[in-house]
């Protein structure tokens, strides 16, 4: 009887250790994300290209690294910005600026698009404000790595499968 109690306590300790390991992995990933956010001064320091509007410069699925510590916006710079009232960030190139108004950039355009983005802006919005609308400037990229996120968005059941596999791996792992 004493040996079965000892075995139960050992199993409970192992289970708790596995759950804590899984929590450690998740919290480490979260801390790394927040650390990148602080260093880059961007709410989203890494984004995935979701459309072909920036081809041939960036393809759908490319992973972009952003930096948002610049105060000026230059023509030709590739920016990621949010349109007020919409939740998906847009990756486009600056084709015109307002030098007379500090911090304001206007007329982004996808390299593969015929027209600029002014039709995408919120009603009565003629420009993008650097402080409010810009998520960051593209400083680097890794081709096709972000395609995993696109697949997870397009096929929600894959998220469940991946989380289940990650949880299973943590639970199976013995130290």
Swiss-Prot record:
GO molecular function terms attached to this record = serine-type endopeptidase activity
The residues annotated as the active site are 53, 92, 117
- Membrane topology classification: Single-pass type II membrane protein
Substrates-to-products reaction catalysed: Cleavage of hydrophobic, N-terminal signal or leader sequences from secreted and periplasmic proteins
> Does the record carry Protease as a key word?
yes
Q: Cellular component terms, GO, for this chain's entry? A: signal peptidase complex
Judging by the UniProt lineage, the source's domain of life is: Eukaryota
Topological domain, Lumenal: which ranges?
32-175
Q: Which residues lie on this side of the membrane: Cytoplasmic?
A: 1-14
- Please give the NCBIfam families that the UniProt record associates with this protein: sigpep_I_arch
Q: What is known of its domains?
A: The C-terminal short (CTS) helix is essential for catalytic activity. It may be accommodated as a transmembrane helix in the thinned membrane environment of the complex, similarly to the signal peptide in the complex substrates.
Q: What is this protein called?
A: Signal peptidase complex catalytic subunit sec11
Species: Penicillium rubens (strain ATCC 28089 / DSM 1075 / NRRL 1951 / Wisconsin 54-1255) (Penicillium chrysogenum)
Lineage per the UniProt record = Eukaryota, Fungi, Dikarya, Ascomycota, Pezizomycotina
Gene name, Swiss-Prot/TrEMBL: sec11
């Amino acid at each position: 009887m004493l040996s079965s109690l000892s075995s139960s306590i050992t199993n409970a300790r192992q289970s708790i250790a596995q759950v804590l390991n899984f929590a450690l992995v998740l919290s480490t990933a979260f801390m790394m994300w927040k650390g990148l956010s602080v260093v880059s001064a961007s709410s989203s320091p890494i984004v995935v290209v979701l459309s072909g509007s920036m081809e041939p410069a960036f393809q759908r699925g490319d992973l972009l690294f952003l930096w948002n510590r610049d105060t000026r916006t230059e023509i030709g710079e590739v920016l990621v910005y949010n349109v007020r009232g919409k939740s998906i960030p847009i990756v486009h190139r600056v084709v015109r600026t307002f030098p007379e108004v500090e911090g304001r950039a206007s007329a982004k355009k996808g390299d593969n698009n015929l027209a600029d983005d002014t039709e995408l802006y919120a009603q009565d919005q003629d420009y993008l404000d650097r402080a409010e609308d810009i998520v960051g400037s593209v400083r680097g990229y890794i081709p096709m790595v972000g395609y995993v996120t696109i697949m997870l968005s397009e096929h929600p059941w894959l998220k469940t499968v991946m989380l289940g596999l990650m949880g299973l791996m943590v639970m199976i792992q013995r130290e």
